[in-house]
């Protein structure tokens, strides 16, 4: 490690006063067995960070004995993430090694903890150490830090890393004691420079048998070596392999700027996730929300920062969350004037449902970052706020237990994995580029597609996540988490947590829901959700396709045949019918029912109606997609042997009124088959109407709103529209496969 002390502080080291070193015959030989019970791992940590707990978890997996120095003490070793330092570690180790000064049979391995993972067993470690022929073996790296000028004093090596790294070393207790007892410097002086100068003394190096692990047989420092490291999967264990030297290191050290890469490796090594066992620690340290007792208080912060499809459905889902509403405070920031009517419609229900509510509207003129800072700080300042649940309006939580599940995962920060339907776009990044933007990790696709299931340490999350309230109060007390930089608010948020060493976890153990696509949401339409069949097909179907359509397609006896080869089935929801009619009336340019029609290629309509074509309102492509997706499969199930591409040139809404055009004379349609959907209710919106098929003398007099009539067109099914006697009747017609 390094810290902020000036580099040249100990250019002059005191002379070493060492007892005679072991002779060559006393040094360990490759065949000498070493008892793992004589091995002690010593590390340093001032706080039980998530990195430290990860280190302990890996040590426990292999049954290492670990002694931690410095817990609860103040760190005085400098800002080792940015400059030199770390001398405090040597001072602590010096004091500790006094206990083992005479233990010739004991082997000590010293490693950092926050950025270290153990990947092999004590037996393997000791075997490799003995094979090294050393009394003290340091890890090695490609950089001569902190003084590059010392590089020429290092012995040349044929293959491997040349320079010492102080983040890990292993040796006999007596030898380590002889080394560290020479420390007489400041806590923020540099530990690596101290060990480097001792190693560069040729006489001392030979006398004490000091060596470097040039080929990463034991220690793998990641800085400068990321291209050398790959994951090696066994059935119930994962470790790393150094492909440059064909070694299997035991200590993985994310030194320097490689913390995120270590987090990635730590998702697997040693048993984070294995092909056979799956997630190896997902069930550790969980909490259970006991029944009969009040669950933790939650601050639910909802953000509507952009025009978002299906917002009324999102607001209604808040009422359905499987969590006691009297334990939830709701904060809602709406940045869009367009959505004010939607929120106004739902706000009375939300007020009655949750224990407390706060609405911040567009009139406050808060930026997205400022709004998020405001919400998070309200939780931070409230000692009763146990969890902060941030939820963006484009996150569709179909799993109503999401909040409960995330709380029980018992992490400081955790997000549910969400992705766009059928896409790889998700609410997390598996890696970062050098400029801290998106980069795809090797396992990204497997995580999004849930081919690997577990809890993952990732560098970026957004749109939905849960944070412990005490984490905000104790570890992230500053208010400007989102708006404190020029970057995107979510990127600033994630960097704030990463810089504090707080892990950003992602769970894909459950199906939580999905994300909406919002970039092409056009609010110029009266009902813009209607246009979302391409971008958000699942949500579009839920809102606009009849709830019984799927049952009808599966042959559950819903489809009726009121006339020969005339099939009747549920297709559109009431909302779809209403919004389609509203769009047409909003457009308002009805044809007038004349034979002359400039919209047609020939300019003449033989059987004219008062209508508006889908093309006129910009809905042609969307309607054709509906035909392909929903009408085509139904047609092929009703007419076996017929395959349709669901092509249609004529797609239009017809309006019938007694004083305008009440009926339609007998005619054949210019189609292979025709789709005719009732868009409003007989008896409520109009009287009369219906359809008569003359060849069969068969009348359908009571069309059902949202139900479609499907019948052959140009040859057999000669038909007429019966008179509408009162009100206004609307139908949607498509001439399919003309």
From Swiss-Prot:
Cofactor: Fe(2+); L-ascorbate; Mn(2+)
SMART domains assigned: P4Hc
Entry GO CC: collagen-containing extracellular matrix; endoplasmic reticulum; endoplasmic reticulum lumen; endoplasmic reticulum membrane; extracellular exosome; extracellular space; Golgi apparatus; rough endoplasmic reticulum
Positions bound to UDP: 44-46, 112-114, 256-259
Signal peptide range: 1-24
GO molecular function, one term: procollagen-lysine 5-dioxygenase activity
Tissue expression remark: Ubiquitous. Detected in heart, placenta and pancreas and at lower levels in lung, liver and skeletal muscle.
Stretches assigned to the Fe2OG dioxygenase domain: 647-738
Membrane-topology descriptor: Peripheral membrane protein
Region (Important for dimerization) location: 672-715
Keywords attached to this entry: Dioxygenase, Disease variant, Disulfide bond, Endoplasmic reticulum, Glycoprotein, Glycosyltransferase, Iron, Manganese, Membrane, Metal-binding, Multifunctional enzyme, Oxidoreductase, Secreted, Signal, Transferase, Vitamin C
Pfam families referenced in this protein's UniProt entry, alphabetically: 2OG-FeII_Oxy, GT_PLOD
Reactions accelerated catalytically: L-lysyl-[collagen] + 2-oxoglutarate + O2 = (5R)-5-hydroxy-L-lysyl-[collagen] + succinate + CO2; (5R)-5-hydroxy-L-lysyl-[collagen] + UDP-alpha-D-galactose = (5R)-5-O-(beta-D-galactosyl)-5-hydroxy-L-lysyl-[collagen] + UDP + H(+); (5R)-5-O-(beta-D-galactosyl)-5-hydroxy-L-lysyl-[collagen] + UDP-alpha-D-glucose = (5R)-5-O-[alpha-D-glucosyl-(1->2)-beta-D-galactosyl]-5-hydroxy-L-lysyl-[collagen] + UDP + H(+)
Region entry Required for glycosyltransferase activity, spans: 25-290
Localization per Swiss-Prot or TrEMBL: Rough endoplasmic reticulum; Endoplasmic reticulum lumen; Endoplasmic reticulum membrane; Secreted
Regulation affecting activity: Lysyl hydroxylase activity is strongly inhibited by imidazole.
Stretches for region Accessory region: 295-520
Disulfide bonds: 279-282, 379-385, 563-698
Binding partners and assembly: Homodimer.
Physiological role: Multifunctional enzyme that catalyzes a series of essential post-translational modifications on Lys residues in procollagen. Plays a redundant role in catalyzing the formation of hydroxylysine residues in -Xaa-Lys-Gly- sequences in collagens. Plays a redundant role in catalyzing the transfer of galactose onto hydroxylysine groups, giving rise to galactosyl 5-hydroxylysine. Has an essential role by catalyzing the subsequent transfer of glucose moieties, giving rise to 1,2-glucosylgalactosyl-5-hydroxylysine residues.
Description of its domains: The N-terminal domain mediates glycosyltransferase activity.
Protein name: Multifunctional procollagen lysine hydroxylase and glycosyltransferase LH3
Annotated organism of origin: Homo sapiens
Higher taxonomy: Eukaryota, Metazoa, Chordata, Craniata, Vertebrata
């Amino acid at each position: 490690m390094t810290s902020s002390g000036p580099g040249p502080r100990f250019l002059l080291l005191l002379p070493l006063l060492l007892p005679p070193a072991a002779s060559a015959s006393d040094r360990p030989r490759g065949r000498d067995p070493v008892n793992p019970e004589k091995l002690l791992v010593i590390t340093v940590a001032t706080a039980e960070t998530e990195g430290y707990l990860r280190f302990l978890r890996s040590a426990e997996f292999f049954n290492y004995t670990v002694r931690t120095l410095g817990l609860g003490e103040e760190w005085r070793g400098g800002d080792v993430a940015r400059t030199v330092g770390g001398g405090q570690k040597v001072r602590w180790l010096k004091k500790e090694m006094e206990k083992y000064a005479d233990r010739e049979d004991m082997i000590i391995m010293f490693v950092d903890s926050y950025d270290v993972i153990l990947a092999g067993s004590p037996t393997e470690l000791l075997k490799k150490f003995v094979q090294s022929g050393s009394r003290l073996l340091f890890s090695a790296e490609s950089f001569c830090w902190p003084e590059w000028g010392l590089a020429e004093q290092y012995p040349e090596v044929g293959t491997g890393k040349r320079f010492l790294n102080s983040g890990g070393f292993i040796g006999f207790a007596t030898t380590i004691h002889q080394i560290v007892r020479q420390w007489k410097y400041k806590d923020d002086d540099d530990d690596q420079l101290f060990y480097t100068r001792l190693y560069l003394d040729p006489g001392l190096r030979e006398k004490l048998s000091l060596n470097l692990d040039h080929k990463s047989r034991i220690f793998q420092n990641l800085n400068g070596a990321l291209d050398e490291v790959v994951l090696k999967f066994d059935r119930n264990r994962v470790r790393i392999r150094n492909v440059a030297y064909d070694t299997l290191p035991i200590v993985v050290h994310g030194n320097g700027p490689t913390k995120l890469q270590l987090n990635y490796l730590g998702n697997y090594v040693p048993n984070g996730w294995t092909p056979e066992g799956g997630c190896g620690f997902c069930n550790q340290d969980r909490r259970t929300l006991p029944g009969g007792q009040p669950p933790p208080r939650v601050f639910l912060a909802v953000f509507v920062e952009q025009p978002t499809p299906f917002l009324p459905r999102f607001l209604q889902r808040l009422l359905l969350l499987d969590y006691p509403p009297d334990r939830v405070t709701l904060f809602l920031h709406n940045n869009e004037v367009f959505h004010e009517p939607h929120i106004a419609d739902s706000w009375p229900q939300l007020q009655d449902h949750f224990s407390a509510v706060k609405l911040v509207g567009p009139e406050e003129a808060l930026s997205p970052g400022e709004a998020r800072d405001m919400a998070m700080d309200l939780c931070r300042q409230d000692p009763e706020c146990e969890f902060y649940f941030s939820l963006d309006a484009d996150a569709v939580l179909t799993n109503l237990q999401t909040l409960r599940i995330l709380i029980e995962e018992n992490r400081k920060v955790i997000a549910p994995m969400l992705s766009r339907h059928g896409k790889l776009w998700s609410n997390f990044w598996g890696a970062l580029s050098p400029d801290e933007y998106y980069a795809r990790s090797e396992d990204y696709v497997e995580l999004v597609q849930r081919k690997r299931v577990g809890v993952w340490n990732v560098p970026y999350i957004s749109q939905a996540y849960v944070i412990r309230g005490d984490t905000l109060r104790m570890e992230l007390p500053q208010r400007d988490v989102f708006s404190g930089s020029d970057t995107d608010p979510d990127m600033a948020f994630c960097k704030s947590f990463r810089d504090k060493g707080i892990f950003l976890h992602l769970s894909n153990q459950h199906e939580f829901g999905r994300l909406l696509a919002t970039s092409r949401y056009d609010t110029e339409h009266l009902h813009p959700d209607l246009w979302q069949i391409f971008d958000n097909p699942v949500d579009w179907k839920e809102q606009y396709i009849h709830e019984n359509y799927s049952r009808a397609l599966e042959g559950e006896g819903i489809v009726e045949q009121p006339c020969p080869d005339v099939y009747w089935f549920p297709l559109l929801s009431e909302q779809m019918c209403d919004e389609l009619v509203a769009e047409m009336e909003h457009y308002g340019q009805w044809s007038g029912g004349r034979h002359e029609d400039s919209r047609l290629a020939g300019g003449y309509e033989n059987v004219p109606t008062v209508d508006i074509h889908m093309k006129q309102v910009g809905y042609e492509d969307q309607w054709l997609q509906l035909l392909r997706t929903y009408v085509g499969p139904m047609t092929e199930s009703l007419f076996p042997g017929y395959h349709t591409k669901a092509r249609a040139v004529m797609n239009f809404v017809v309006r019938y009124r007694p004083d305008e055009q009440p009926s339609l004379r007998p005619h054949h349609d210019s189609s292979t088959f025709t789709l005719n959907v009732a868009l409003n209710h007989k008896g409520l919106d109009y009287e009369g109407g219906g359809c008569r098929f003359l060849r069969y003398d068969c009348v359908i007099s009571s069309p059902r709103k949202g139900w479609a009539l499907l019948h052959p067109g140009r040859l057999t099914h000669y038909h007429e529209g019966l008179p509408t006697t009162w009100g206004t009747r609307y139908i949607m017609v498509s001439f399919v496969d003309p």
